[in-house]
Structure formats: C-alpha cells, structure tokens
C-alpha cells in the first residue's frame, strides 16, 4: 500500500494561506487569553504557522488544519508559560 499523494507545493501553500487568513484572529485571541499578552500571542501563532509550513509539505495537509494550527499555538503558549514560571521561580 502506498502513502497518500501529497498536494503540490503551490497548492499546499495556498491551502495554508487560506486556513491562516480564516483562523489567525481566532488563534491569536485564544493564545492572548492564555498569555495575557497580545504581542506574544501573535508571535506564538506565527510560530504555529511556521511549524505548518515545515511539517505539512512532508506530512500532507491534516484532516483539520485549523485544529492543527490551534493546538500547535496552544502548546507553544503552554511552553512559554512554563518557561516564564520557571524564570520567575529562579529570580
């Protein structure tokens, strides 16, 4: 059995761009609620977008790209909050 066919790179980037335009504000708002910092939320959401640009060409478009981006951004936010808490404990 062969692996599923991956979409061509241009089509994939158009799909990523489309999902990002639709979901970016929602992702940033969710992460901003977690971090209480809109600027940091924008950075973390963009980190999730970069991760998609790195992973999706190899792995293919996930079944629910919006959920993938949201989950990745939330995980980045959790990592950030943990690092921030650790830094505060050290000082």
PLM segments and residue spans:
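Sigma70-family region 2
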Residues: 47-65, 83-85
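Short, small-hydrophobic-rich alpha-helical interface motif
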Residues: 41-52, 69-72
